């Protein structure tokens, strides 16, 4: 009797239907991309293929960066802001009390704590060029339970 080995098959949907892992991005990450800061290529490499999330304060923060650049005569900031607005980033409402508690716990600004809070809520990694926020995220996200 001859026993044949079964063939293993995997059927996959087209790429646009595949789940993209979530990633919380802060203003430093987005600014690096859209204003072509020296670290933009690193930021792009880290976020490609990810589903991007941010607290809704991101809009005001990126607008603030653009305004500062425009006041310094950096006219390219207008295009960068338009690019930021056009990006697919899921914006989330904050839990102000939870954000304030994280800000106190890790000695962060409320703005930075908002990104940390969202990463914890989504159980997702946080992308930032801010060393203090990154360290708080390393500590806090490691304490989360599945």
Language model features with spans:
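Short, well-structured N-terminal submotif of metal-dependent ribonuclease cores
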Residues: 1-54, 69-78
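A general structural signal for well-ordered alpha-helical segments in protein cores
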Residues: 27, 40, 59, 63, ...
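Acidic, PIN/NYN-like endoribonuclease modules and their adjacent C-terminal/linker elements
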Residues: 1-22, 54-55, 116-146
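Short glycine/serine- and small hydrophobic-enriched flexible loop segments
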Residues: 64-71, 120-121
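Acidic catalytic patch
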Residues: 79-106, 117
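Residue-level detector of anion-binding/catalytic polar loops
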Residues: 90, 109, 123-125
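Alpha-helix capping/helix-boundary segments
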Residues: 29-30, 58, 98, 115, ...
């Amino acid at each position: 009797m001859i026993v044949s080995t079964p063939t293993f098959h995997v059927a996959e949907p087209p790429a646009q239907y595949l789940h993209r892992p979530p990633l919380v991005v802060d203003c430093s990450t987005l600014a690096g991309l859209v204003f072509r800061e020296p670290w933009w290529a690193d930021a792009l490499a880290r976020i490609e293929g990810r589903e991007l999330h941010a607290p809704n304060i991101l809009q005001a923060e990126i607008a603030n960066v653009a305004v500062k650049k425009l006041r310094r005569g950096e006219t390219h900031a207008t295009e960068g802001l338009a690019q930021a607005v056009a990006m697919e980033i899921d914006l989330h409402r904050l839990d102000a009390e939870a954000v304030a508690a994280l800000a106190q716990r890790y000695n962060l600004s409320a703005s930075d704590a908002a990104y940390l809070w969202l990463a914890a809520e989504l159980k997702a990694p946080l992308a930032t060029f801010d060393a203090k926020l990154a360290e708080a995220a390393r500590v806090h996200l490691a304490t989360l339970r599945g």
